């Protein structure tokens, strides 16, 4: 993957409704030393003042200011003929900007009219075709600021390259729920959760209601399996994702070795890497470094997890000739010889329940 581009990319939220999403977008921009602005079409400024901060007004921008002062402009949404963010090379210009849209409706129709590029994150789920807007913003900034990185792999049997995912120690149920949503959107049919903080399994009814508010409108499940700190496993390799400058960079690590490999994403606000017995997961353990430009920023688990999942999904790849042959959705690959966990454990979560994360 190439080095960082010289000019920071301004992140613009178009019609964002949820002020907490807006706050997380501001934090995502800070990770990449990027400014962040909002085009307020849905009363965001008022809800921001009422819920997040009455002392720190939301930085706003109009469509006219965006068109006048920024170039190139990237419309970042699932638009017709949008290019993949994987391998995308941003054209030169005085002040680049990437615009992400409303949580439910996406970009307003007048944004693509002033955009120089249309770019999207390839989704691998048949039903859930979007990420949390703040998580998508982090993925956009990660790849665009690094010149796009490698292209999406095209394989005859990509699911044979899909590793297991373990989300470890998330401190907040919304951050964890958004990460599970990302895993489902990127094509995982199951994942493991080490719920040390009790934010997902067995939490109080209010937390469950907040985290899983959307109705079950369809059947598009992901199986969430609990793991425990005292369990030992028999993976061939465990890759631990960290912001610390140790191990191979994320874009250089081989993260598509199939089910014998587990990608562990710890919440580094709650998990001390140095005190963990990583050998309980696999005979081979290596750290993988997710590098971001900023030295100080507000940590959000969903941002780290989604960037990681996006890169793993890129390496796993898509079915050959996806535009002509619809990929067959394989069932999750279980290594029965290892007897990791009983299929009866855990819970099935329908991805439509995660749309509000």
Segment roles from a protein language model:
Residues 1-357:
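Post-transcriptional modification and biogenesis factors for structured RNAs
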């Amino acid at each position: 993957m190439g080095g960082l581009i010289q000019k920071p990319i301004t992140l613009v939220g178009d019609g964002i409704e949820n002020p907490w999403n807006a706050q997380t977008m501001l934090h995502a921009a800070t990770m990449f030393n990027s400014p962040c602005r909002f085009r307020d079409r849905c009363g965001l400024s008022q809800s921001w003042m009422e819920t997040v901060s009455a002392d720190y007004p939301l930085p706003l921008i109009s469509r006219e200011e965006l068109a006048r002062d920024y170039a190139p402009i990237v419309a970042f949404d699932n638009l017709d003929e949008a290019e993949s963010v994987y391998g995308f090379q941003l054209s030169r210009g005085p002040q680049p900007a990437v615009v992400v849209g409303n949580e439910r409706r996406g970009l307003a129709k007048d944004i693509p009219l002033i955009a120089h590029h249309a770019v999207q994150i390839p989704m691998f789920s048949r039903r859930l075709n979007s990420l949390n807007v703040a998580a998508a913003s982090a993925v956009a900034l990660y790849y665009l600021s690094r010149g796009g990185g490698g292209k999406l792999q095209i394989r005859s049997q990509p699911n044979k390259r899909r590793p297991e995912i373990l989300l470890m120690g998330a401190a907040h149920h919304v951050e964890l729920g958004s990460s599970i949503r990302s895993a489902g959107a990127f094509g995982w049919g199951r994942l493991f959760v080490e719920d040390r903080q009790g934010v997902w399994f067995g939490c109080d009814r209010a937390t469950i209601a907040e985290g899983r508010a959307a109705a079950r409108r369809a059947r598009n499940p992901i199986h969430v399996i609990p793991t425990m700190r005292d369990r030992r496993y028999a993976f061939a390799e465990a890759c631990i994702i960290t912001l610390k400058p140790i191990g191979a960079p994320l874009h250089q690590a081989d993260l598509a070795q199939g089910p014998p490999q587990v990608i562990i994403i710890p919440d580094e606000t709650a998990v001390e890497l140095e005190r963990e017995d990583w050998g309980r997961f696999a005979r081979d353990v290596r750290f993988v470094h997710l590098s971001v430009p900023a030295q100080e920023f507000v940590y959000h688990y969903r941002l780290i997890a989604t960037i990681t999942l996006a890169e793993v999904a890129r390496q796993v790849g898509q079915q050959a000739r996806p535009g002509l042959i619809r990929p067959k959705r394989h069932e999750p690959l279980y290594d029965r010889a290892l007897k990791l966990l009983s299929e009866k454990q855990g819970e099935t979560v329908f991805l439509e329940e995660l749309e509000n994360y």
